[in-house]
Amino acid sequence: MKRTLFDKIWDAHVVDRLEDGTCILYIDRHLVHEVTSPQAFEGLRMAGRLVRRPDATIAVVDHNVPTSDRRAGIQEPESRLQVETLQKNVAEFGVPYFDLLDVRQGIVHVVGPEQGISLPGFTIVCGDSHTSTHGALGALAFGIGTSEVEHVLATQTLLQKPAKNMLVEVRGKMPPGTTAKDMILAIIGKIGTAGGNGHVIEYAGEAVRALDMAGRMTICNMSIEAGARAGLVAPDDVTFEWLRGRPFAPQGEDFDRAVEYWRSLASDEGAHYDRVVVLEASEIVPMVTWGTSPEDVVRIDGTVPDPDRATDEARRTQMRRMLDYMDLKPGASIADLPVDVVFIGSCTNSRIEDLRSAAAIARGRHVADGVRALVVPGSGIVRQQAEQEGLDRIFLEAGFEWREPGCSMCLGMNPDKLTPGQRCASTSNRNFEGRQGPGGRTHLLSPAMAAAAAVTGKLTDVRTLNVEETV
């Protein structure tokens, strides 16, 4: 029988199958952070259980950590307690841990791939919805709840029913000035935030194959915003060369043998997909969200939509509420909308390639008056590499803040927050009401577009700026 990439990974990890179709699924890698793990470890402690495979588990701190002046420690009591609790738990249960003083520390979905902890063909889980990021390597990666975190810690398995297969094919070549972030926003704009419900999305097509690994991680990261359980890209030579030599990846002849297996994971020609969606890459332009859901997206050269043109009353009511919250008027041009804050970071867009893209815009320019701009590397390794390349100097000379790694302003769980009414151009993945701080207004876009907003003080079509390709 012809099988998809998802089918092959799933079948290889089924320990047992129950009569109702539920499977006991073996988990290769379990990633843990400070927010969703405390109750799970406490459950183990109360039951007198151990972590089944500490060697297949990695813990990091990312959500609650400060990204500036770390010498002062974590000031917010609840955040400090969560970090201290994780430190206590990993020490007690013998789980490897990248703490705040470890250069490998960072956002879990940046750290896993860059360390080679995440590998093609693996099943990977974490108590975090954006675990789908790791699917860029050709892994089946998805978020789980705290009770499931405890289950994996105790058994290295999960009870799961298989998802449906969905193929998103992006044909042709992406136009100049467009990025993976524009691609995934266009996909979500087309299928909606419920479009992938019950499915695992496999991304394919010439435009997807042309993406580097950072770009593939961006699109897989936001599969959740399309409603999918996970996102996947079949591993290829781009994947293998990117993984070669990474600390936790196989080495030498073991790596070569692994590549032979990884090549076999690609979907069979003629394999069945329950749903197929096709986009033409040539039609994708720089995108930006206007509302409070990732599906509320328009072209940067477009206008704010009119609720009166919506097809039903529920949607009209929803759109009016969003416009009121975002302080926007129907028909207004999305370009030239003033911004107060720019955030370049998050598990969606904080890798070295993202920072290079933003630095290409920032170089020789300066952050506009009245705008605060933050650049937050996704890990200590990314920060170190950026500083070796001189990207930090480009940002600092342009008036950006250069931060330590962490989730930062992606979510309001640490000191980096918006204040009510502030408008932010953000490279993160969610624009819900209050996501970046109570009353904050979020516009999702690419790193290059965010940098363009920072130096012009408004949402700007990056294609109108004269930008050098290298930094």
From Swiss-Prot:
Coiled coil ranges: none
Family stated for the protein in its record: Belongs to the aconitase/IPM isomerase family. LeuC type 1 subfamily.
Binding partners and assembly: Heterodimer of LeuC and LeuD.
GO biological process per UniProt: L-leucine biosynthetic process
Binding site for [4Fe-4S] cluster: 347, 407, 410
Cofactor-binding details, from the entry: Binds 1 [4Fe-4S] cluster per subunit.
Cross-referenced NCBIfam families: leuC, PRK05478.1, PRK12466.1
Cofactor(s) in the UniProt record: [4Fe-4S] cluster
Reactions catalysed according to its record: (2R,3S)-3-isopropylmalate = (2S)-2-isopropylmalate
Pfam families listed in its UniProt record: Aconitase
Family annotation (InterPro entries): 3-IsopropMal_deHydase_lsu, Acnase/IPM_dHydase_lsu_aba_1/3, Acoase/IPM_deHydtase_lsu_aba, Aconitase_4Fe-4S_BS, Aconitase_4Fe-4S_dom, IPM_dehydratase_rel_enz, IPMI_cat
Domain of life assignment: Bacteria
Function in brief: Catalyzes the isomerization between 2-isopropylmalate and 3-isopropylmalate, via the formation of 2-isopropylmaleate.
Annotated source species: Granulibacter bethesdensis (strain ATCC BAA-1260 / CGDNIH1)
Phylogenetic classification of the source organism: Bacteria, Pseudomonadati, Pseudomonadota, Alphaproteobacteria, Acetobacterales
UniProt key word Repeat: no
Pathway it works in: Amino-acid biosynthesis; L-leucine biosynthesis; L-leucine from 3-methyl-2-oxobutanoate: step 2/4
Alphabetized UniProt keyword annotations: 4Fe-4S, Amino-acid biosynthesis, Branched-chain amino acid biosynthesis, Iron, Iron-sulfur, Leucine biosynthesis, Lyase, Metal-binding
Protein name as annotated: 3-isopropylmalate dehydratase large subunit
Gene this protein is translated from: leuC
One function term, GO molecular function aspect: metal ion binding
Alphabetized PANTHER family for the sequence: 3-ISOPROPYLMALATE DEHYDRATASE, HOMOACONITASE, MITOCHONDRIAL-RELATED
EC number(s) per entry: 4.2.1.33
